[in-house]
């Protein structure tokens, strides 16, 4: 089954998130559990959560993906910034315990001239404190484009974080197609090679989701500018190969393209037609 969704709003609640996803022929959805700029999250409404659970129990929607606020930086040089990131992360994980089958995706962070090794140490230290044995949510490290001092451009950097996690069974990876292409992995001309490299360094069992985005800029550009499907430098042929690849096709895919809800519906219809 092709599991495809898009980044949608929870401003009208979680049940509405599921209903809106189904209305655009999606069977999963990504959302911000709070403002992408941080701040307090709205209190959970149990009836609303129950509505989402019932919807997921009775449809093909099996999993949802929460995306951490962009401001989170567990690798920051500033202790205040790290503490704020930790508090948001911890609160989000506690809230997600109350939601149906879900994962929590985050940008690993930027080391801000401290060096990659120090940044990796700070991230893994925080994750070891955040991860609980009774936690239901799987935490996903996202592949990054390599802007500035971002950590996570290379598979080696992500693996260096994961190998330091005590309860690493609760940690996975989300590949962003725009990010890895901008970061230097040629998924257009050598998708098999990139997948094999990921498998040899991290392991395909860690790959839990894919952000399916075209890229406004070219290979190794380190720009991180998403483009609509088929309108960027990755192109429709490579995207078709990605969604149909035998090692990727059963993963959940999430659109983060520059679109409104109707635009997402058009892309989902297009991709469903290309899925074989």
From Swiss-Prot:
Domain of life: Archaea
Reactions catalysed, as given in the entry: Endonucleolytic cleavage to 5'-phosphooligonucleotide end-products
GO molecular function list: deoxyribonuclease IV (phage-T4-induced) activity; DNA binding; DNA-(apurinic or apyrimidinic site) endonuclease activity; phosphoric diester hydrolase activity; zinc ion binding
Annotated residues for binding of Zn(2+) 3: 179, 224, 226
Presence of the UniProt keyword ATP-binding in the record: no
InterPro entries assigned to the protein according to its UniProt record, in alphabetical order: AP_endonuc_2, AP_endonuc_F2_Zn_BS, Xyl_isomerase-like_sf, Xyl_isomerase-like_TIM-brl
Residues the record lists as binding Zn(2+) 2: 142, 176, 211, 256
Protein name listed in UniProt: Probable endonuclease 4
Cofactor note: Binds 3 Zn(2+) ions.
Family stated for the protein in its record: Belongs to the AP endonuclease 2 family.
Its biological purpose: Endonuclease IV plays a role in DNA repair. It cleaves phosphodiester bonds at apurinic or apyrimidinic (AP) sites, generating a 3'-hydroxyl group and a 5'-terminal sugar phosphate.
GO biological process: base-excision repair
Keyword DNA repair: yes
Organism, scientific name: Methanosphaera stadtmanae (strain ATCC 43021 / DSM 3091 / JCM 11832 / MCB-3)
CDD domains the UniProt entry points to: AP2Ec (cd00019)
């Amino acid at each position: 089954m092709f599991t495809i969704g898009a980044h949608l709003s929870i401003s009208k609640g979680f049940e509405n998130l599921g209903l809106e996803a189904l209305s655009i022929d999606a069977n999963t959805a990504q959302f911000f559990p709070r403002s992408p700029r941080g701040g307090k999250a709205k209190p959970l409404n149990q009836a609303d959560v129950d509505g989402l659970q019932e919807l997921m129990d009775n449809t093909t929607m099996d999993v949802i993906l929460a995306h951490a606020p962009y401001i989170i930086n567990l690798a920051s040089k500033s202790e205040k910034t790290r503490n704020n990131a930790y508090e948001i992360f911890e609160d989000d994980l506690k809230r997600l315990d109350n939601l149906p089958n879900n994962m929590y995706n985050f940008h690993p962070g930027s080391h801000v001239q401290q060096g990659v090794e120090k940044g990796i140490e700070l991230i893994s230290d925080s994750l070891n404190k955040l991860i609980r044995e009774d936690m239901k949510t799987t935490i996903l490290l996202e592949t990054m484009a390599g802007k500035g001092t971002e950590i996570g451009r290379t598979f080696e950097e992500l693996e260096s974080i994961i190998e330091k996690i005590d309860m690493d069974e609760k940690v996975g990876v989300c590949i962003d197609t725009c990010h890895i292409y901008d970061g230097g992995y040629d998924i257009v001309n050598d998708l098999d090679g990139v997948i094999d490299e990921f498998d040899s360094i991290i392991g395909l069992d860690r790959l839990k989701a894919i952000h399916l985005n075209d890229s406004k800029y070219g290979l190794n550009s380190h720009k991180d500018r998403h483009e609509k499907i088929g309108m960027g430098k990755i192109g429709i042929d490579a995207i078709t190969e990605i969604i149909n690849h035998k090692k990727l096709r059963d993963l959940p895919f999430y659109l983060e393209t520059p679109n409104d809800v109707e635009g997402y519906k058009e892309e989902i219809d297009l991709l469903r037609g290309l899925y074989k």
